[in-house]
Every structure is written in structure tokens, then in C-alpha cells.
Amino acid sequence: MNTIHVDVVSAEESIFSGEARFVALPGEAGELGIYPRHTPLITRIKPGAVRIEKEDGTEEFVFVAGGLLEVQPNCVTVLSDTAIRGKDLDETKASEAKAAAEEALKNARSDIDIAMAQSELTVMAAQIAALRKYRQKK
């Protein structure tokens, strides 16, 4: 069976390392699907869910808050400042953080404050969407 080695790494730890049949993740220009022997690629990724179809057919979900993707014919590497296993996502905390970001956006006075609040809001909305997608697959 053809597989591709996948590494998902955050600033703190390695979140996933193993063989997979397929990987899907949110690229900057849209959803990317990667199979073994994919053409080499380096691109930025948006906040969202990384779906890894493992060798045994089970799926692993990881939320990433953006980052970089490197694809080689036999290897996929996802680098993200923040990466959280699907099973570790907390919808209550994410919803509270999203509400705080919305409030910060309303009260923002400078361009920097607006940009920071918008960025946090985007990440939290993507985290909630990833959590819901993970729950549907369980």
C-alpha cells in the first residue's frame, strides 16, 4: 500500500508523526489534498483542520492556527505555532475566546488592535469549525 510520512509540529511539540494514505488541509488558496508521490510544494496554510487518513483507514484531526506546509513525494511536514489534537479541542473555551475577540474588535481603536482582534477572531472561528468537523467524524 502506498503511504506518505506525515509530521505535524507545533512550537511546543510534535502533534502527529506517522504514515498516512491521504492528508487534507486548508491552503492559502483553498483546500489541499495530498496523496503519496505528490509534486513538491511549499505554501502557507490557513487556520483550520488537518485531516490525516492513517494507514489503517482511521482518521486523525489536528487544528492548526495557520503555518507552513512542505510536501515532498514521500513526506508531508506541517509547521504551526499552534496545533491542537482534535480530541483536545474545547468548544466552550474556543467560544469564550471568540466572544472576547469580537468584543476586542468592537473596542479596538488602532489599526494594530483591529488587526490583532480580527486575526484572533479568524483563528477561533476556524477552531470551532474544526471541532464540529471532528465531532461529526467520531
Curated annotation (Swiss-Prot):
Q: Which UniProt keywords apply?
A: ATP synthesis, Cell inner membrane, Cell membrane, CF(1), Hydrogen ion transport, Ion transport, Membrane, Transport
Keyword Membrane annotated: yes
The record's annotation in InterPro entries points to: ATP_F1_dsu/esu_C_sf, ATP_synth_F1_dsu/esu, ATP_synth_F1_dsu/esu_N, ATP_synth_F1_esu_C, ATPsynth_dsu/esu_N
Q: Which domain of life is it from?
A: Bacteria
The Gene Ontology terms for molecular function here are: ATP binding; proton-transporting ATP synthase activity, rotational mechanism
Tell me where the transmembrane regions lie: none
Record Gene3D superfamilies: ATP synthase delta/epsilon subunit, C-terminal domain, F0F1 ATP synthase delta/epsilon subunit, N-terminal
Q: Which GO terms describe its cellular component?
A: plasma membrane; proton-transporting ATP synthase complex
Q: Could you tell me where this protein is found in the cell?
A: Cell inner membrane
Question: What membrane topology is annotated for this entry?
Answer: Peripheral membrane protein
Please give the family membership noted in the entry. Belongs to the ATPase epsilon chain family.
What job does this protein perform?
A: Produces ATP from ADP in the presence of a proton gradient across the membrane.
Assembly with partners or alone: F-type ATPases have 2 components, CF(1) - the catalytic core - and CF(0) - the membrane proton channel. CF(1) has five subunits: alpha(3), beta(3), gamma(1), delta(1), epsilon(1). CF(0) has three main subunits: a, b and c.
**What is the protein name stated in its UniProt record?**
ATP synthase epsilon chain
